[in-house]
Amino acid sequence: MAEVASQETEFAAFAFGSVVERRDELEGRPWISYPVRVVADTPELVAVYLSHGTLLTFGDGPFSWGPHPWGPFGDRWQSAGILQLHRPGRGHSVWVLRDADTGAFREWYVNVEAPWRRTPTGFSTLDHEIDLVVPADSRTLRWKDVEKFEERARIGHFSPEEATAIRTEAADVAREIAAGEQWWDTSWSRWEPPAGWHALLQSFETEGS
């Protein structure tokens, strides 16, 4: 079963520019892990940056959910660099997606997932399948992968209580976006990484923490 975990705060905040691990943890093991750089780490906001070309490390199977879906695309992040925003305690993160050719802001991508759990090496979460896509300069959103989520719920990958909490989280953030009351500052769409924040190629220990 997946866990809808609460944010833990027993570890100190990470400094700007620190390289930390961002992982999806399934059944007590990393399903996918990759290094990111810290942009902000406060009680109200955690922001990390995933650079183009960064190494992706996939957990050793088998997993009840099967291999991580990014696996067929290789062990490097091939899209443009992504800023990921998370409000501690919320069950989603917001990814700032840019055009791979021009670098222009393209859309907000709301990734519904377990609230980030702080670890000694970074942050742990688990994707909950549902996504919301919000094009630049628009409050019109598109729901994505709802059918995949409902299938996981049907076959028991989420308990009934977990499934209800996930649906509620997705609906809540959708309402906030429609009302123009999203929690994140839209000026993050203009944020640029410092020069030199190139691909990260280190991996982290695969032991749970």
Swiss-Prot record:
Description of how activity is regulated: Hydrolysis of (S)-HPP-CMP is inhibited by CDP.
Function: Involved in fosfomycin biosynthesis. Catalyzes the hydrolysis of cytidylyl (S)-2-hydroxypropylphosphonate ((S)-HPP-CMP) to give (S)-2-hydroxypropylphosphonate ((S)-HPP) and CMP. Can also hydrolyze (R)-HPP-CMP and cytidylyl 2-hydroxyethylphosphonate (HEP-CMP), which is a biosynthetic intermediate before C-methylation, but the catalytic efficiency is much higher with (S)-HPP-CMP.
Essential cofactor(s): Mn(2+); Co(2+)
Subunit structure: Monomer in solution.
Pathway(s) of this molecule: Antibiotic biosynthesis; fosfomycin biosynthesis
GO biological process, one term: antibiotic biosynthetic process
Active-site positions on this chain: K144 (proton donor)
Similarity annotation: Belongs to the FomD family.
Chain sites annotated for binding a divalent metal cation 2: E129, D131, D145
Keyword Hydrolase: yes
Alphabetic keyword roster: Antibiotic biosynthesis, Cobalt, Hydrolase, Manganese, Metal-binding
GO molecular function, one term: hydrolase activity
Encoding gene (name): fomD
Species assigned in the record: Streptomyces wedmorensis
The keyword Manganese is assigned to this record: yes
Protein name per UniProt: Cytidylyl-2-hydroxypropylphosphonate hydrolase
Binding-site residues for a divalent metal cation 1, renumbered to this chain: N111, D127, D131
